[in-house]
Amino acid sequence: MTEQTQDENKLIAERRAKLEHIRANCPANGHPNNFDRKHKAADIQAEYGHHTKEELEGMDVQRSIAGRVMAKRGPFLVIQDVSGRIQAYAGKDVQKDLKATFQGLDIGDIIGVTGKLHLSGKGDLYVNMEQYQLLTKALRPLPEKFHGLSDQETRYRQRYVDLIVNEESREAFIMRSKVVSAIRNFMIKKEFMEVETPMMHSIPGGASARPFETHHNALDMAMYLRIAPELYLKRLVVGGFERVFEVNRNFRNEGLSPRHNPEFTMMEFYMAYADYKDLMDLTEEMLSSIATDLCGSTQLPYGEHTVDFGGPYARLSMLDAIKKYNPENATIQSMTYEEVKDVEFMRNLAKSIGMTIEKFWTCGQLLEEIFGETAEPQLMQPTFITGYPADISPLARRNDENHFITDRFEFFIGGREVANGFSELNDAEDQDNRFKAQVDAKDAGDDEAMFYDADYIRALEHGLPPTAGQGIGIDRLVMLFTNTHTIRDVILFPAMRPQG
């Protein structure tokens, strides 16, 4: 047992003893649930913070607040609620009347206070206690440095403590909630219908990823946590719902990184009688609108950069992006799609720039990996990358002029992908062939290749109208709006490796 653990255990024992003393002397103050909190700290500060001491005394304002004690300086307490902080003052009469509870009060305890508003000599508002109630005794002490936790692992594992002591964390998750609400409101105004599709699939599909597998006892069958809602959402478009969207979790049995968490939130939507260019226009409008509404500007700081959501956003093909960010590589500068179709040429090119490749990678996979290695990190400003090869886009419509590529884009900001969209493949026979190619790829060792979904083919055979669809990674988008650089900072309870 470390010295720190011994000290903490001692403090916990002391607090337990205080709680027992409170219960013995003031039974109602054990864990009461009858305090009527009528006001919040921030509302009080906003309404009365500009008044003088004399004005407040003349107004005779009575307020009832509740929250966590964050500091105790003699008779003054700093109380924190969801909106902010305000002080409370306990005069000698109050301390005498409530001696059993007030003297045993610790940082972290949750209390309710009623009294008149006053202004201190330093110009701070405070509630002069007339009534006081201990609502919850905190048995564990908060970190000594009241302004925050220094250990990142502890912040993620004990998010409840992080939220208590770190204002930046609270603000990040408030912003997350606002971003999700803003997206939802935007979609509803555009006449999209919000829907809910299954989280457990009998056949995983809609993305190239390893699924989590579970077992349904009653049906005695394997089930998979969904990796994407795409195939179900497109079934709804077949059924006649022309504009649908869903905000929900996806699960992918893959590694952890600053950009990846096994469960993450996506907003995925589909619109009939539209193509991938319409999606790009809609994305520009959405993000520009949300940035303006939530931040008051389309220009947001991100690390050492300023990201401009104002648009128009850059648009270039994957091949052109590789050429743009490899100006000194003569082979890349002269590369054509005919050469991209040559798997040996692409393997040699990847090896020449120091990449390690998998033997089952196709021409399209090699092109995407070269793009990811050399171009993607450079895409700080909002950029649509188009021209994704068909062999890595099994659900996307082929380009009319170049059948090697599809009418697909991925959207990048801050050097990472944030969204993926395309004109949907609605040719049932082409989809059938591409599913079969995915099965062959899986047999060759690609465990992220898709499964064959016969029911989805059946749905397409009923007729999917010309449709475009897109998924937006909420977590990565929130990282941009909160100027954070790891996905764990915007997921309340991220996946963590076991301790010890």
UniProtKB/Swiss-Prot annotation:
Mg(2+) 2 binds at residue 417. Its EC number is 6.1.1.6. Its main location: cytoplasm. The keyword Oxidoreductase does not apply. Coiled coil: none annotated. GO terms for cellular component: cytosol. It catalyses: tRNA(Lys) + L-lysine + ATP = L-lysyl-tRNA(Lys) + AMP + diphosphate. InterPro entries: Aa-tRNA-synt_II (IPR004364), aa-tRNA-synth_II (IPR006195), aa-tRNA-synth_II/BPL/LPL (IPR045864), Lys-tRNA-ligase_II (IPR002313), Lys-tRNA-ligase_II_N (IPR044136), Lys-tRNA-synth_II_C (IPR018149), NA-bd_OB-fold (IPR012340), NA-bd_OB_tRNA (IPR004365). One of its GO terms (molecular function) is lysine-tRNA ligase activity. Pfam families: tRNA-synt_2, tRNA_anti-codon. Binds 3 Mg(2+) ions per subunit. It is found in: Cytoplasm. Its cofactor is Mg(2+). Keywords: Aminoacyl-tRNA synthetase, ATP-binding, Cytoplasm, Ligase, Magnesium, Metal-binding, Nucleotide-binding, Protein biosynthesis. The keyword Magnesium applies. One of its GO terms (biological process) is lysyl-tRNA aminoacylation. Homodimer. HAMAP family: Lys_tRNA_synth_class2 (MF_00252). Belongs to the class-II aminoacyl-tRNA synthetase family. This is Lysine--tRNA ligase. It comes from Shewanella piezotolerans (strain WP3 / JCM 13877). The lineage of its organism: Bacteria, Pseudomonadati, Pseudomonadota, Gammaproteobacteria, Alteromonadales.
